[in-house]
Every structure is written in structure tokens, then in C-alpha cells.
């Protein structure tokens, strides 16, 4: 039987293989209990084109492990992505449930110009 982390990593691996087959930019989300991170990665997978996290100087002053902070990261990654000329991405939630902080980040990114 799988433990929780192994099951999450298995889901993430399947999702990444599917996105790689599509050949589009990928918005990757990683979360820890204290912070949330987002990166836009090139279709080849070898280059990070934009990144944002609660460790950024503009977001570090507030709370970093809640839904509001995740929404702020979503807004920031959308702004940085559109300034880099990226509007269409595939959402890679890294095996995490589409709920809570992951959902808040995705919704904020959509509202600020990224298309999933």
C-alpha cells in the first residue's frame, strides 16, 4: 500500500507525462506547510521562465501559509508570465488536491491573465 507522499508523487508523474506530450508551457505549483511556490516552465522542461513564491520580498511580510497568500502568488505569477509573453499554460498541481491554497493560486492566476 502506498503512503500519502508516494501516491501524490505517482499522480504528479502521470500528470507531467501528459503535459509533456501536449508540448505547452507548464505552471507548476508546490506547497509546504509554510510557503507556496509557482513556476512557469518551458515546454522542453529545461528552463524556468517565471517564478513567484511567498518568499518574494513583496509577499514575505504578511502571512505566508494561507489562502490569501496563495492568491497573491497566483496574481504575481500571472503578471510575470504575461510580461514574459506567456498567456497559455497547463496547470501542474504536482499531485496536490485542487482545493484550498492550490485552488486559490489557480483562480488568481486565471483572473489575472493566464489561460489554462
From Swiss-Prot:
Source organism per UniProt: Psychrobacter sp. (strain PRwf-1)
Role, per record: This is one of the proteins that bind and probably mediate the attachment of the 5S RNA into the large ribosomal subunit, where it forms part of the central protuberance.
GO cellular component: cytosolic large ribosomal subunit
Family indicated by similarity: Belongs to the universal ribosomal protein uL18 family.
Any one GO BP annotation for this protein: translation
Listed InterPro entries: Ribosomal_uL18_bac-type (IPR004389), Ribosomal_uL18_bac/euk (IPR005484)
Keyword Ribonucleoprotein annotated: yes
MF terms in GO: 5S rRNA binding; structural constituent of ribosome
Keyword Aminoacyl-tRNA synthetase: no
Subunit comment: Part of the 50S ribosomal subunit; part of the 5S rRNA/L5/L18/L25 subcomplex. Contacts the 5S and 23S rRNAs.
Name under which the protein is recorded: Large ribosomal subunit protein uL18
Keyword vocabulary terms for this entry: Ribonucleoprotein, Ribosomal protein, RNA-binding, rRNA-binding
Gene name of this polypeptide: rplR
Amino acid at each position: 500500500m502506498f503512503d500519502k507522499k508516494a501516491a501524490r508523487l505517482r499522480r504528479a508523474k502521470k500528470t507531467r507525462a501528459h503535459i509533456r506530450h501536449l508540448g505547452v508551457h507548464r505552471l507548476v505549483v508546490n506547497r509546504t506547510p509554510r510557503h507556496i511556490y509557482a513556476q512557469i516552465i518551458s515546454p522542453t522542461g529545461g528552463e524556468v521562465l517565471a517564478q513567484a513564491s511567498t518568499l518574494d520580498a513583496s509577499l514575505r511580510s504578511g502571512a505566508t501559509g494561507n489562502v490569501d497568500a496563495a492568491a497573491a502568488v497566483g496574481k504575481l505569477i500571472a503578471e510575470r508570465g504575461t510580461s514574459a509573453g506567456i498567456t497559455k499554460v497547463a496547470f501542474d498541481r504536482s499531485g496536490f488536491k485542487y482545493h484550498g491554497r492550490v485552488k486559490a493560486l489557480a483562480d488568481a492566476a486565471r483572473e489575472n491573465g493566464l489561460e489554462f
